[in-house]
Amino acid sequence: MDRRAEFKRWKAQCLSKADFSRKGCVDEDVVEIVQLLNGREQFFTTSSCAGRIILLEQGMDSLEVQKQNCCWLLVSHKPCVKDDVIVALKKANGDAILKFEPLVLHVQCRQLQDAQILHSVAIDSGFRNSGITVGKRGKTMLAVRSTHGLEVPLSHKGKLMVTEEYIDFLLKIANHKMEENKKRIERFYNCLQLALEKETTTTNSHPKEKIKEKNNSYKKKSNPGKAHDKCVTEENDKVLENDDDDDPGISVTIFPEDY
């Protein structure tokens, strides 16, 4: 089957499936990004989460946090207050963990060059743990992610191990991370619009030269945040310089799995 036709079939199948996430719909903060990507023939989103504060309870015999085997005590895509967590903790009989998870977005791309465009946008927007994977059937997936998270145990075997004052302190950190995550999402959307507009203009004018130039420029990037000058403003550049908890490198991996 022709590669374009096969990708089109994959996209139609994915977008026609029901949303089996807990929320059952796309998070408000990423709706525009998802719509923009799915409106382009070379992309479609397979999963997304705009970022959330969650309180999980795991079994008393479990050594690792595994969300599929946990009880979700609290889930919020907005800033939380201490009382929300205290009330939720009263339902815990095992080990409760407070977490903040930043944006995660998975996009299947028609070809590697398309994924490279999105990867540059993600890096420039502060999602510096983003990466590309290529499956054995040629499925190219771009994951937008960062290490801007938080995970702290609060109780053990139903007993609260920290003070309410410390919970309030943790929530201030989590809420701050939530606000920073939202700013990164906004930067990502703005950069994505610019990148796709530039791509459309270049494709319509010099399609063959565009592909060759795009591949060369991607390979030569040593500092993607400064190389992609169409996306990074002076203000954004200062913000990105302070993102000490993110890996500044490019992650492009090829795995022999199928996606």
UniProtKB/Swiss-Prot annotation:
GO cellular component entries: cytoplasm
Gene3D superfamilies, sorted: tRNA wybutosine-synthesizing-like (3.30.1960.10)
Pathway assignment: tRNA modification; wybutosine-tRNA(Phe) biosynthesis
GO biological process: tRNA methylation; wybutosine biosynthetic process
Any one GO molecular function term: tRNA methyltransferase activity
Family: Belongs to the TYW3 family.
Official protein name in the record: tRNA wybutosine-synthesizing protein 3 homolog
